């Protein structure tokens, strides 16, 4: 029985030949991957087959590589994964990192000071500071989320005060140049704020009493970007990768740190519905370009 089953188990490895993992180059890093030999060995042992890392110049190139099948596995930002999903419908998230404090992602918040904006319905009659257009929590999430809730808001809404940076938007609230601002907060997998960072804490650190600050609205959670595989990858390969990645932090933390330097809490399983917020942003962006 065992000898008959072994060739079948090996079929997916034979079909793939070399398992290719795509990552985006670090700024100024060229094609170098810190700890490449250790990472390659770790994935090779997990899959029981030859593994190669492919370094893409940017997420657009990485998306194209996975959509075309040149790589089977890719490490994405949330919006890059959503873009890949829209591009080909051929990818699925496997795992995503969390922070040491349990945060699994972020959400946008609308913050007011001293009750200047009484509620969300009054927003349009006040001055609201908003971050630049490439800022996810300070621009993309509020415009996408509020529009999805039926609130009249657009990039050129007259009540929006466009700040040159997220920090500048915070300063505008602190100096009284704005009655509210769109910021962010970290959120756990349960959808609750972890109270371990974000705009309110930054404003408090800048000298604004926390008791004077109020959150009027929160967006849906944007989960941290996933490691995603092609949907047509063999189920056994997906299982092996999931077991390897979800145990990586506890078993070989040094390898985990090489693979994920921004979020130190380990990997947890992820599913497509975790990225509905990211998909909404990508679709909103696409609609604006048409």
Predicted regions and their residues:
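C-terminal segment of classical bacterial N-terminal signal peptides
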Residues: 2-9
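An extracytoplasmic/periplasmic, membrane-proximal ligand-sensing/linker region
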Residues: 12-38, 229-290
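Pocket-lining segment of extracytoplasmic ligand-binding domains
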Residues: 127-234
């Amino acid at each position: 029985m065992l000898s008959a089953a072994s060739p079948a188990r090996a079929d997916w490895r034979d079909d793939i030949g070399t398992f290719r993992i795509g990552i985006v180059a670090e700024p100024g890093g060229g094609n170098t991957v810190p700890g490449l030999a250790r990472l390659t060995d770790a994935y090779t042992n997990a899959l029981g087959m030859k593994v190669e890392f492919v370094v893409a110049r940017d997420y657009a190139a990485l998306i194209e590589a996975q959509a075309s099948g040149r790589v089977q596995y890719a490490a994405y930002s949330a919006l890059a994964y959503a873009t890949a999903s829209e591009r080909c419908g051929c990818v699925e998230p496997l795992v995503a990192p969390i922070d040491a404090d349990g945060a699994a992602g972020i959400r946008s918040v609308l913050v007011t000071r001293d009750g200047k904006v009484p509620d969300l319905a009054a927003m349009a009659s006040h001055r609201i500071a908003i971050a630049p257009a490439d800022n996810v929590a300070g621009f993309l999430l509020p415009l996408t989320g509020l529009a999805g809730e039926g609130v009249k808001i657009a990039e050129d809404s007259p009540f929006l005060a466009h700040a040159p940076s997220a920090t500048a938007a915070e300063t505008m609230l602190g100096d009284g140049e704005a009655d509210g601002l769109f910021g962010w907060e970290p959120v756990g997998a349960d959808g609750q704020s972890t109270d371990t960072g974000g705009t309110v804490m930054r404003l408090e650190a800048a000298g604004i009493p926390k008791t004077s600050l109020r959150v009027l609205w929160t967006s849906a959670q944007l989960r941290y970007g996933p490691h995603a595989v092609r949907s047509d990858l063999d189920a056994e390969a997906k299982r092996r990768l999931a077991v390897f990645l979800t145990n990586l932090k506890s078993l070989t933390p040094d390898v985990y740190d090489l693979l994920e330097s921004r979020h130190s809490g380990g990997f947890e399983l992820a599913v497509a519905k975790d990225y509905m917020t990211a998909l909404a942003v990508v679709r909103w962006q696409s609609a604006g370009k048409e």
